[in-house]
Amino acid sequence: MSETKIKIKDLATELNIAPKEVLAAAKKLDIPAKNATSTLTTEEARKVRGQVQEASGDARRKDGASDVIIRRRRKGSGAKPAAREEAAPAETEAQASPAQPEAKAAAPAAEAEEAPAAKPAPAKARKAEARTEAPRARIIRPATPQAEEKAEPAPETAAPAQPAPEAQSAAPEKVEAHDAGAPVQQAETTESAPAEPAAEKAPAEKRRYEVSMEPEKDSVQADTEADGDADGGRKKKKKKKREETAGPQVRVISRPDPAAVQAQAAAAAQAREERAERPDRGPRPAGARPAGPRPGGPRQGDSRPGDGRPAPRSGAPRPGGARPAAGFGQPAQAENSSPFADGQSKKKRQKGRRTVEFGDKGAGGKKMREDVGGNWNRGKKGKRKPETKPVSTQPQRAAKRKIKVDEAIRVSDFAHQMGVKAPEIIKILMSLGIMATINQSLDIDTATVVAAEFGYEVEKVGFSEDEFLLPKEVDADELLLPRPPVVTIMGHVDHGKTSLLDAIRKSSVTTGEAGGITQHIGAYHVSTKRGDIVFLDTPGHEAFTAMRARGAQVTDLVILVVAADDGVMEQTREAISHAKAAGVPIVVAVNKIDKEGANRDRVMRELAEQDLVPEEWGGDTIFSYVSAKTREGLDDLLEMLALQAEVLELKANPDKPARGRIVEAKLDKGRGAVGTVLIQEGTLKHGDAFVCGVFSGRVRAMFNDQGKKAKQAGPSIPVEVQGFEGVPVAGEEFICVKDEKVARRIAEQRAIKQRERDLARESKVTLETFLARRKTDAETQTLNLVLKADVQGSVGAITDALRKMQTEKVKVDIIHSGAGAITESDILLASASDAIIIGFNVRPTAKVKDVAEQEKVEIRFYDIIYKLSEEIKSAMAGLLAPVVREQYLGQAEVRETFSVPKVGTVAGCHVADGKIIRNTKVRLLRDGVVIYTGRINSLKRFKDDVKEVAKGFECGMGLENYNDIKIGDIIEAFEEVEEAATLD
């Protein structure tokens, strides 16, 4: 506390009240104070003290006046007198009894009179005395002047002092009876400044005994009556009926055993010296003084002012030793300040005797007298009601209620978490324009808006797979070892990519390929004189764009194969774009230089237009001229690859769990789901658990590019892994985890999130979109397909190719697609949806064929993708209605008309152009306007029926059901021809 200002909480501690009461007093005085840390000036503090004293005085005058008797056992007087000499002036200064000065010399006689009066105490009182033999109870009141004014009227604040030496020479007392009807004088017994440091040394003791005395006033009264009735039966047990009387609010303080608190004397004395200069803060809690016992002796006078005291104060000295050192923030019950410190059991303590508990109340561990009471249960012995905590001066802000939501949440689950009914949430969604059902999923944005309507806050949580997946920290340089480069061969179809790889590997891959073209992405590990190289062979067909993109993503180098006789083609440009997008250096291999018509300069010029300038022309692109057929230039190409790989300094850490990419995946009939994995870092071993996309698994077996079993695979090594739970998507990341349980959990969470995203992403149907869809469906034909291929990459390539072919007139709907053989379920699905089954490099079993015949399902088989594309295109065109085209035949001019009975009007015509054919369609034109469209009923030349009449001849012509023919009309003959519709 500074010289000029004092904080609210410090002032509350000084006045032994809660900060909220100081704030209330300041508010009455119009003193601005917001919280307990606000400061007051000296003048403001003085006003607040006066206000608090006035309020506490009013409260004291309302207290009852029943007698309260607290007994203490007689103790030896061997305690030290130093403490009493120190505290006696302060304690006796506030003694309120006018008869106390006369009692100085009468201590022995007073004690002799008091002891017999105390003997006939009730049995329950004596049992409690036995339990609390060491502590002696005293009723003390706050020592500050403010507390004094609060406790009693002003005229009674002064009392003669009691000398310390006489009090020290008094004999120990057996029982001390306090007058409960004199609360004013009781509050003054320890009212002095020197007593204030002692009050701070045992706040824990004080807090415990401050709890609630008021509900026990009846027991106190009963004890008083028992003392007056009995003379000598101290061992006699007697239970008195409890009566509810209005007694004063008192605090009973028992002292601990002096032998148990000697160790705390030094610390307590030092603390008392430090706080000696601070203002008074209230009464001194009980406990041994640091320097010795209190002096005994009778009080000045035989009783306190009030209803009468049974006996004068006994002269038993307080035991010496330090007070229990308890600060403002220490626990309420110290080891030696407890009523049970003398070894008395809790069971005995509960038998009908009033017991006192410490309570942690008020600021700094202090409790106001107005708050004492109300926490004791008089119905059952030894049981106490839970104490109420002080209310904070500041209103507590309501905690935000939170709902934990993953990627999406169903309406029913959302309602359950918020504790509301689902229709209420649906009503809110309808007001937001969302027609939702109870099982519909809501994304996190919609859920946030809805939760705000109910006062909730949405917290995005969920399963975090990052903590399970291995961290991608940067490996130390000493752990990195050189790895083989991954080289992807790209280029246009039929430019010799696979043939070049065969020449390098000295194998014959092309001989086993359908149509001589590559339709799968292949990974090959090749050992050369310059070191190991891993080649990825990608398809060049336009349908395999995704495969080429995957190859460029996982590679270190790209060999762009360009035929010397063809030059740069469409897929060549696409491959260049993929390589540039992946940031991969390109090495150009000009193939077929042995063929006639090879033009190297043309290739260089066309590549320069694509920003691939050769080194010969001042660029930085490496060109190599090779012939896969004659093996010319292969050594130079490998030399260039080794040089480029050395520049890149390719390294990886093999001593860690493996990570890689799925290059290709398929469903093998005997082995299940199999994926070709290119390891990028770490080492993949047999038995490792892994997760890949929404699938998990364990490595059951590994095969290298030559089909041989492998036990492990290091960085840049391609292996075929067996053990997937499902066919993974090509291009997915392959990650090893610590065990299969973690892998399965990650895969399940990914699958759940994927499904929730798909459900939440579904577009809502409006009237406009519904009508537009119906109109489109009526005009559009749909070709339903069930697609099965040998590998997952082919499925993706065919799907992309078919979707590119669909037009506004014909849509392609791939109902189901997958890698693996055609099964019975595929047949049944196609039958139910009127679909055609497309098999790419797969064949059905005999049983499946029989099912297809029974269900009348058509199955088409292909092994070359461009043949598949052509036939699907023809099938799509076949769904369209044929196009009807009108073909002009000729014209005839009407020169004369004849009326023939039973026939009608016959026109005599001259064929001016073309020819007129019988039974063809005609138009009758009059002044250029079409008057009639119909057919020729009869055609004659003279009297003979003819099939046709050529140009320049005359004929007679009758029209079907039309007779209004006039001279000068023009008859135009035409026919309708049906043509097959096209998708263009």
From Swiss-Prot:
Top-level taxonomic group: Bacteria
KW Transferase (keyword) present: no
InterPro entries: EF-G-like_DII (IPR053905), EFTu-like_2 (IPR004161), IF2_II (IPR044145), IF2_N (IPR006847), P-loop_NTPase (IPR027417), Small_GTP-bd (IPR005225), T_Tr_GTP-bd_dom (IPR000795), TF_IF2_bacterial-like (IPR000178)
Assigned keywords, A-Z: Cytoplasm, GTP-binding, Initiation factor, Nucleotide-binding, Protein biosynthesis
Region (G4): 591-594
Region of interest: Disordered: 32-402
Subcellular location: Cytoplasm
Region (G5): 627-629
Keyword tRNA processing appears in the UniProt entry: no
Record-linked Gene3D superfamilies: 1.10.10.2480, P-loop containing nucleotide triphosphate hydrolases, Translation factors, Translation initiation factor IF- 2, domain 3
Residues in coiled coil: none
Domain tr-type G: start-end pairs: 482-651
Start and end residues of each stretch annotated as G1: 491-498
Low complexity bias spans: 89-123, 154-172, 187-197, 255-270, 308-334
Region (G2): 516-520
NCBIfam families referenced in this protein's UniProt entry, alphabetically: IF-2, small_GTP
Entry's family note: Belongs to the TRAFAC class translation factor GTPase superfamily. Classic translation factor GTPase family. IF-2 subfamily.
HAMAP family: IF_2_B
Name listed for the protein in its UniProt record: Translation initiation factor IF-2
The gene coding this protein: infB
